[in-house]
Amino acid sequence: MVSFGGLARKIFGSSNDRRVKTLRQRAEQITALEKNYENLTDEQLQAKTAEFRAALAEGKSLDSLLPDAFATAREAAKRVLGMRPFDVQLIGGMVLHERGIAEMRTGEGKTLMATLPVYLNALEGKGVHVVTVNDYLATRDAETMGRLYNFLGLTVGVIKHGLDDDERRAAYACDITYGTNNELGFDYLRDNMKYERAQMVQRPHNYAIVDEVDSILIDEARTPLIISGPLEDRSDFYNLIDTFIPPLAEEDYEVDEKQKTAIFTEVGTEKVEKLLEAAGHLKGESLYDIENVAVVHHLNNALRAHKLFQRDKDYIVRNDEIVIIDEFTGRMMPGRRYSEGLHQALEAKEHVTIQPENQTLASITFQNYFRMYNKLSGMTGTAATEAEEFGNIYGLEVLEIPTNLPVQRIDEDDEVYRTVEEKYRAIVRDIRASHEKGQPILVGTTSIEKSEQLAERLRREGIKGFQVLNARYHEQEAYIIAQAGVPGAVTIATNMAGRGTDIQLGGNLEMRVRQELSDVPEGSEREEKIAAIKADIAQLKEKALAAGGLYVLATERHESRRIDNQLRGRSGRQGDPGRSKFFLSLQDDLMRIFGSDRMDGMLQKLGLKEDEAIVHPWINKALEKAQKKVEARNFEIRKNLLKYDDVMNDQRKVIFEQRLEMMDEEDLTETVAEMRHEVIEDMVILRIPKDAYAEKWDIAGLKQDIASKLNLDLPVEEWAKEEDIAEEEFENRIKEAADKAAAEKAERFGPQIMTYVEKSVIMQSLDNLWREHLVNLDHLRSVVGFRGYAQRDPLNEYKTEAFELFQTMLANLREVVISQLMRVEIVGEAPPEPQLPPMAGLHIDGTTGENDFDEAIWAEHQHDDRIVPPAQRDPADPRTWGKVSRNEPCPCGSGKKYKHCHGAFE
């Protein structure tokens, strides 16, 4: 039965189809200009950039220039890169220009498509950022596409790890800047820790195109970028806590894999209480007394480290370090650390060096970083499943771009086995059969551990020549993937999301040339060898096509349909044939966590024998339903986290804007006076409450506050004795005295130095208090969730208390700044330190440690008028001895050293 919605779509087409149809008409208009542009000389084509910029200066819009700018970029791509963007790429380019997300299948040319809107938007000169997932892709795309932009007179920069500030500033000043999401985010945070505008590297955030947009804006949305500084070393404590976990029995804790939580049961709590008491780390009577909050936090981290985090799946141990593995891509993330002590708990678990805990100095999530851009767009092979999230959080519409050629890949139904062992036996059989007929195979696994287990099985079965691609061998990644389309190739890979390199049937020409001809100079010999490699690849491609194209064999389903679709999408690029199939077992994580018990019982009733699979579209639908549930739950988590982060983000914006204003101010006299007056008002209202009787006034406290905060000694006791004096009069007199002292100081310092001092004190104080405030917000966030049990909305509680903390921070800022400015003085140059006398060479007795002193000491110190020659000293009168060295024999004649005799009394 066809639903009404389905029937309407058949008659009128979906909204996606209608939108594509409109854009296709515009693409045809651009194609109609192609002949005109083909007739232009290189110089005429290059002159178009200046022509477009002049039109923009006269008030024309980018939209009005789009057809000609796209036609220019297309023609330049043909001449410089030897590639012509298809009409579907023009459609994708328009989506990117119009703040959308272009979902484009793998191999359809996303990188080339992006050049069209990049060129158009770079004409404004405000900067365009092309964001990729790793340094390799950023550098590769900047080099390849940079030739096109340079031809058209635009500058291109690349931001990657290891650049200094000058190099970064130059790259951001370019018309087009390629870089990774991490580098861009960290540069923003670092800029907001600088003290002068000239030190900053980024320009205002104008336009960004995010490649693999789902990976960056969804998968990594929960991961904040944090710049931190080390705290004290507590490695002994982490190691102690870690010893408590391995002896625990299953009854001592509960693990919820769905929610990814681990907690102690009542029995377990009693056990760890006894262990803590024995170790002297339990305060009070119960583990849950307020004094033990930090200990409970560390215990929970240790339990999570042991029971929720698996080595070679969630992290690997390399060079005495814990390196996190991206759960979506299988990539290592060196330098990335879990916060709040979890990373240290993992280090203790694996017995590697425990790095000190860090204090957050600055942080931001990708969600809030990318929402700062005036214009944001993205491209990916898979985004439709997350269209709701892109719309709700980023205001981005997802448009599926049709393929240039029809997709010929066959997506087979999943094969489900009862046990993991049966599943792997079936996988090995299938790999052997496909390998023997020369079909290239890409095997997708969900973890390093599983990819290596499968590799070991293939070795035992005598299948040779396979490649393993996972986080351990990140460096060879691009080359391995580039050759995965060669006939008979078997490539085992952890999740392929965001890999960024196409698998071309027959092999990748560019990669082979780079690998095989790196030492062959330009010339006829090199050209001949390139022609030979081309012919070889063409031959290999024919063989791969004859064998059925690339076979994507997945060993497990991921929580996200999008990751599964990305893996499938590696096959069948640009109209090539191919096939994909998922092999599952009821013991797989997704099946086990989401109700495989019912399915297991049903399969047993059906009489499923060992090594027999069930294949049915119903299974696929059931799995898709489970995945949708997980995706919906993860979306809710991200949405909820964003609501909390938005509170911090609003405060972050206020602080960062204040810092920028401070950098630009040339005279801070009024700002500081305002802060000083507010401090005085707060001081007076605290000690002399409004309308309170004089007996209730705390005059002694007020005098102390004036001394500590304003560095003034004012006769407030005398003022208090005056008749009819009110709090306003106190305020006015204190303000007058403080303003006078500040004005005198400004007169002594001079305006330039005073402004510099004020700026330095305000910004340093602001940074220190902001860091403390971030810690307070983290603590508030960790406890506010429990308010839900008291029927109070945790988010509203967080908003209210975070605002109060912010107000307190600003009040503290005023006090700290004014207190320091009222005390600061210019210190004259310190006198040069006196030169030490040359050391005298003394003979030391090796057996007694005594030295030949007497006259040598005198010779050494004769410049000092406090030294009296030994012959002039009266043993009975210490006043005649002058200055005596501590190691000199005591002048009293005891035979002891001075330090052990009369010198002991000094």
From Swiss-Prot:
Keywords, sorted A to Z? ATP-binding, Cell inner membrane, Cell membrane, Cytoplasm, Membrane, Metal-binding, Nucleotide-binding, Protein transport, Translocase, Translocation, Transport, Zinc
Enumerate the Gene3D superfamilies for this protein. Answer: 3.10.450.50, Helical scaffold and wing domains of SecA, P-loop containing nucleotide triphosphate hydrolases, SecA, preprotein cross-linking domain
Give one GO molecular function term. metal ion binding
Q: Tell me the residue numbers annotated for binding Zn(2+).
A: C890, C892, C901, H902
Which Pfam families does this UniProt record tie to the protein?
A: P-loop_SecA (PF21090), SEC-C (PF02810), SecA_DEAD (PF07517), SecA_PP_bind (PF01043), SecA_SW (PF07516)
Q: What is the enzyme's class at the highest EC level? A: translocase
* Chain positions recorded as ATP binding sites: Q89, G107, E108, G109, K110, T111, D502
Q: Which residues form the signal peptide?
A: none
> What is the UniProt remark on how the cofactor binds and its stoichiometry?
May bind 1 zinc ion per subunit.
> Topologically, how does it sit relative to the membrane?
Peripheral membrane protein
Q: Which GO terms describe its cellular component?
A: cell envelope Sec protein transport complex; cytosol; plasma membrane
PANTHER family named in the record: CHLOROPLAST PROTEIN-TRANSPORTING ATPASE, SECA INNER MEMBRANE COMPONENT OF SEC PROTEIN SECRETION SYSTEM
The UniProt similarity line reads: Belongs to the SecA family.
Protein name, UniProt field: Protein translocase subunit SecA
The record's gene field reads: secA
